[in-house]
């Protein structure tokens, strides 16, 4: 069978080469048809406000149905190979534009106003969820409740299954309207969560391959090297691009093509630089997106700003939709190991427990550091807990684990992850709208403007901390508040030094001019997008 799939004989055989080209054409045509169907169906569902089948769920279903039909009809192998989910293709071509757009579309005001909470949920919370899941899976195996895996492999599974994909929840937020703080928490946590999960998985994989001489301290050091190094590479590339566009004088009419080409190349430069340094390209391109939107974007001409915003939004939408179709087709075509149903059942139970430990534990810590008027209400914490759907990132890492782990172990993890992804995307994703309305965190009462939610400046945050009585012995709470103050100090540093240095705005951080106008073009917090038209 493998000899039939080799390309080299077809090169010398005109008929074989023609057959390969025909199979490629049919495969790509089917993919395009599924993309068109997915976008049209998503539009119809949005137009009729049918929230029980979100766009991501519809795309996954289309892939599952077409893949099932191809499997039943014994579609020709050369055509089916065009639908195989390759983790290299996913990580090199599909994921980078999605992650970059996540960072590029961040709104600076809500993100930095909730920066401490977002970092707590995404970094500490993801670490807690990974460790809790891995430990529970290991204990479940020891107690003969489920298929037993070695401890490090359990931690690898905990890391990959902690990668959340709340695209369904965010789309419903956009349709129904949501509290600005809640949207910022869910979106910000999801952006950094993927980067954290990938770094944890790669660290655990490295520990497994070099198990001798490793200890917990070295694991933490290796993880910090990967994460901080990748973040530094991304931020460095972003700042370099900002200075280039500030001083190169490209924002003139006859150089707009060059301006846009250079801007589009920088994200992939950041990604490949990190990968070449054995770091995480996903972490790097994420922070490149954040920095380029905050600094480089304002150095572009008005026409180039409109083009790059539309371009990255376009390719990320195509990639995201294609990923769910691609994933659904591959799930239907792959041979899964369903012999360990106990592993699947208890894994689902354990990730629910781990997600609760993540959200409610971190929520408690964040509320310790916040004044009364800034505490995260329990309804928001429940919504954040419910939004922890698993998606393409967990699926891709699980597929990679099939190659990283011994035969049987990786296949068991892949099958369990597949079941979890399908369950969360279809069932939980379909009930998200009802759940959010029951919690009363969406609706017209939450359609507040972006500025209304963040009028309190950093000095008022700091004053509220100083004025509150601090009971004796609350040193931990004091340290948490110092961390929150550092976020406010960074905002002041950005306003007074970084923005004037890296942009041509001369420090006009909060004015209603060009920079703020383009930041607010993509505000997702209202039902009908009428926020920018307010009087």
From Swiss-Prot:
Keyword annotations from UniProtKB, A to Z: Antiport, Endosome, Glycoprotein, Golgi apparatus, Ion transport, Membrane, Phosphoprotein, Potassium, Potassium transport, Sodium, Sodium transport, Transmembrane, Transmembrane helix, Transport
GO molecular function annotation: sodium:proton antiporter activity
Localization annotation: Endosome membrane; Golgi apparatus, Golgi stack membrane; Golgi apparatus, trans-Golgi network membrane
Membrane topology: Multi-pass membrane protein
Residue ranges, Cytoplasmic side: 1-24, 71-87, 109-126, 170-179, 237-271, 328-340, 403-412
Sugar-modified residues: 299
Family the entry assigns: Belongs to the monovalent cation:proton antiporter 1 (CPA1) transporter (TC 2.A.36) family.
Reaction catalysed by this enzyme: Na(+)(in) + H(+)(out) = Na(+)(out) + H(+)(in); K(+)(in) + H(+)(out) = K(+)(out) + H(+)(in)
Region Disordered: start-end pairs: 508-535
Function: Involved in trafficking to the vacuole. Required for cell proliferation and cell expansion, but not for cell differentiation. Acts in low affinity electroneutral exchange of protons for cations such as Na(+) or K(+) across membranes. May also exchange Li(+) and Cs(+) with a lower affinity.
Positions of transmembrane segments: 25-45, 50-70, 127-147, 149-169, 180-200, 216-236, 272-292, 307-327, 341-361, 383-402, 413-433
Pfam families: Na_H_Exchanger (PF00999)
Intramembrane segments: 88-108
GO cellular component, one term: endosome membrane
Residues recorded with modification Phosphothreonine: 470
Phenotype of the disrupted gene, per the record: No visible phenotype; due to redundancy with NHX5. Nhx5 and nhx6 double mutant has a slower development, is drastically smaller and is salt sensitive.
Name used for this protein in its record: Sodium/hydrogen exchanger 6
Lumenal side stretches: 46-49, 148, 201-215, 293-306, 362-382, 434-535
Any GO BP annotation: potassium ion transport
Basic and acidic residues: compositionally biased ranges: 515-524
Expression across tissues: Expressed in roots, leaves, stems, flowers and siliques. Detected at very low levels in roots and shoots.
């Amino acid at each position: 069978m493998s000899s039939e799939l080799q390309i080299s004989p077809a090169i010398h055989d005109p008929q074989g080469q023609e057959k390969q080209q025909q199979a490629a054409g049919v495969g790509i045509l089917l993919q395009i048809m599924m993309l068109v169907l997915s976008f049209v169906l998503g539009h119809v569902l949005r137009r009729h406000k049918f929230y029980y089948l979100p766009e991501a769920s519809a795309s996954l279903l289309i892939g599952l149905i077409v893949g099932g039909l191809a499997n039943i009809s014994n579609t020709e192998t050369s055509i089916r190979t065009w639908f195989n989910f390759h983790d290299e293709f996913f990580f090199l071509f599909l994921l980078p534009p999605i992650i970059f757009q996540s960072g590029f579309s961040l709104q600076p005001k809500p993100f930095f106003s909730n920066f401490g909470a977002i970092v707590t949920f995404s970094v500490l919370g993801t670490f807690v969820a990974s460790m809790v899941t891995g430990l529970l899976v290991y204990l479940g195996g020891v107690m003969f409740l489920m298929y037993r895996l070695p401890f490090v492999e359990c931690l690898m599974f905990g890391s990959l299954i902690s990668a959340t994909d709340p695209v369904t929840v965010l789309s419903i937020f956009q349709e129904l309207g949501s509290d600005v703080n809640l949207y910022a928490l869910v979106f910000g946590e999801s952006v950094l969560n993927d980067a954290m999960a990938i770094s944890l998985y790669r660290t655990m994989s490295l520990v497994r391959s070099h198990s001798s001489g490793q200890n917990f301290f070295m694991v933490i050091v290796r993880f910090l090297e990967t994460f901080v190094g990748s973040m530094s590479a991304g931020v460095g590339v972003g700042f370099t691009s900002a200075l280039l566009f500030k001083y190169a004088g490209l924002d003139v009419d006859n150089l707009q093509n060059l301006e846009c080409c250079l801007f589009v190349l920088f994200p992939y430069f950041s990604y490949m630089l990190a990968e070449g340094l054995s770091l995480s390209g996903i972490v790097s391109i994420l922070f490149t997106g954040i920095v380029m939107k905050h600094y480089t974007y304002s150095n572009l001409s008005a026409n180039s700003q409109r083009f790059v915003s539309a371009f990255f939004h376009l390719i990320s939408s195509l990639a995201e939709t294609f990923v769910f179709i691609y994933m659904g087709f591959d799930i239907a075509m792959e041979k899964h190991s369903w012999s360990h149903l106990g592993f699947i059942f208890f894994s689902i139970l354990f990730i629910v427990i781990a997600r609760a430990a993540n959200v409610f534990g971190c929520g408690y810590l964040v509320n310790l550091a916040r004044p009364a008027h800034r505490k995260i209400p329990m309804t928001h914490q429940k919504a954040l807990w419910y939004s922890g759907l698993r998606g393409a990132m967990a699926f891709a890492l699980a597929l990679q684990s099939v190659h990283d782990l011994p035969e049987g172990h990786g296949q068991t993890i892949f099958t369990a992850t597949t079941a979890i992804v399908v369950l969360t995307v279809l069932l939980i994703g379909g009930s998200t709208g009802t759940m959010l309305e029951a919690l009363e965190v969406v609706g017209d009462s939450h359609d507040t403007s972006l500025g209304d939610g963040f009028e309190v400046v950093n000095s008022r945050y700091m004053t509220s901390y100083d004025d509150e009585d601090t009971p004796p012995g609350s040193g931990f709470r004091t340290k948490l508040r110092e961390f929150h103050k550092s976020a406010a100090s960074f905002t002041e540093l950005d306003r007074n030094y970084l923005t004037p240095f890296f942009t041509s705005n001369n420090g006009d951080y909060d004015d209603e001019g060009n920079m703020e106008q383009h930041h607010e073009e993509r505000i997702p917090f209202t039902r009908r997008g009428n926020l920018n038209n307010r009087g």
